């Protein structure tokens, strides 16, 4: 049996919990999320998956105080952070906490997180032998923690960029007197562009991008890449979103 620690059981930790309960009877789950009533003892776990809220400041930095504390209190086992963290953070956490900190990004939507996790390929950044015993039958790819951290940000920011581009296309079509619905259908005909993030308004019935992830990730990554071609590409993404969606408050 493998003793698996899950720290934080929101939709990310909840998807992991659901999958393991339904797919791997060789895993004993130990869950810590006091606000949700989970207070299991983590002293005998073999591996930990950590997914907690990390505040992202206006300047793009992150407050890692709680994360460092939680990792430092764990036994000497591989710790896989699943929260979106700035590139280079896993290495810093390993150095400062004296633990083996790896990164395993998640690509879930809040509306369909259980289904998303069931069908997705995993990203492994360490402890591969142990992970293949935990995620039996799952497809996976292997990379360094830094590569995985960049993967997560670049994935999310591209989603926001795609939303913004199609909002701008719709607005321009309306200014030109063209039927956006027909143009949208035509754009997708070749199959080179999938329809994800192309519908305007989006699933929430609003223009632009919102939610818990895109706004904070765009802000952080745009700040991090200032002075580079990528930073130039992202420079006006937030203000364009404000143009389409208005100002929203995000934690």
Task: Report each predicted region and the residues it spans.
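Solvent-exposed alpha-helices and their adjacent loops that cap or buttress functional pockets
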Residues: 40-42, 114-117, 200-206
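Rossmann-fold dinucleotide-binding core
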Residues: 52, 78, 84-152, 221
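Short glycine/proline-enriched coil/turn segments at helix->beta-strand junctions
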Residues: 25-26, 38-46, 74-78, 95-100, ...
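NAD(P)+-binding Rossmann beta1-loop-alpha1 motif at the extreme N-terminus of oxidoreductases
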Residues: 1-43
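Short glycine-/acidic-enriched loop or helix-start segments at secondary-structure transitions
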Residues: 16, 41, 59-60, 89-92, ...
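Rossmann-like NAD(P)-binding element
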Residues: 38-78
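Interdomain hinge/lid region at the active-site interface
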Residues: 149, 164-251
């Amino acid at each position: 049996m493998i003793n698996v620690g899950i720290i934080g059981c929101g939709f990310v930790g909840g998807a992991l919990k659901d999958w393991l309960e339904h797919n791997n009877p060789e895993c004993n789950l130990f869950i810590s999320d006091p606000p949700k009533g989970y207070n299991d003892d983590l002293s005998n776990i073999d591996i930990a998956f950590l997914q907690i809220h990390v505040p992202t400041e206006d300047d793009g930095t992150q407050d890692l105080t709680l994360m460092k504390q939680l990792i430092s209190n764990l036994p000497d086992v591989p710790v896989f952070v699943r929260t979106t963290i700035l590139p280079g953070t896993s290495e810093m956490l390993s150095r400062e906490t004296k633990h083996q900190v790896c990164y395993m990004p998640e690509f879930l939507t809040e509306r369909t997180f259980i289904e998303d996790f069931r069908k997705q390929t995993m990203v492994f950044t360490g402890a591969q032998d142990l992970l293949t015993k935990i995620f039996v039958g799952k497809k996976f790819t292997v990379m360094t923690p830094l590569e995985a951290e960049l993967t997560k940000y670049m994935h999310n920011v591209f989603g926001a960029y795609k939303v913004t581009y199609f909002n701008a296309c719709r607005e321009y079509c309306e200014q030109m007197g063209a039927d956006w619905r027909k143009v949208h259908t035509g754009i997708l005909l070749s199959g080179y562009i999938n329809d994800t993030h192309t519908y305007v308004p989006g699933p929430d019935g609003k223009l632009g991008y919102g939610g818990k992830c895109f706004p904070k990730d765009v802000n952080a990554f745009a700040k991090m890449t200032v002075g580079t071609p990528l930073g130039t590409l992202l420079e006006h993404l937030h203000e364009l979103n404000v143009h389409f969606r208005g100002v929203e408050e995000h934690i």
